[in-house]
Amino acid sequence: PNSFLRNAVIGDDVTIDSSKIVESSVGNRSTVGPMSHLRNNTEICEDCRIGNFVEFKNSHFGDGSKCAHLTYIGDSDFGKKINVGCGVVTVNYDGKHKFRTTVHDGAFIGSNCNLIAPVTIGENALLAAGSTITDSVDDGDMGIARARQSIKKGFGTTYKNK
């Protein structure tokens, strides 16, 4: 109910709740919503869970993967059986160029992680909650990146004027 679909391919036994799906596909036995947005060129495979306030753009999300809430996945390739925690963002745009993120099968992405593309997360890797990941993480490894805040005076203005 209350969903908008345009040029969408929807599999069997799919539940879509109050969501928007445009030029994308959702595989068999998957659930989407409420309040999710699947933008152009997104493929959600079979047995996936896309939860509330989740947005995908130009991405692949493999069989059995879950992304339950408050997340942005853009220009990304996610494998099978991946868990994406609340508040995860794939940071795909640096203000001038877009880059891709790749996450391999079985990875666990902790809540409030930022994946700064281009970056690759290995099979069965774990990203600790609250991490900003700027380097690739190998198979089976854990990435943790939490730093103390620092202020760079005037940098915002300098960056915008480049």
Task: State what each model feature region is.
Residues 1-2:
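Core alpha-helical transmembrane segments of integral membrane proteins
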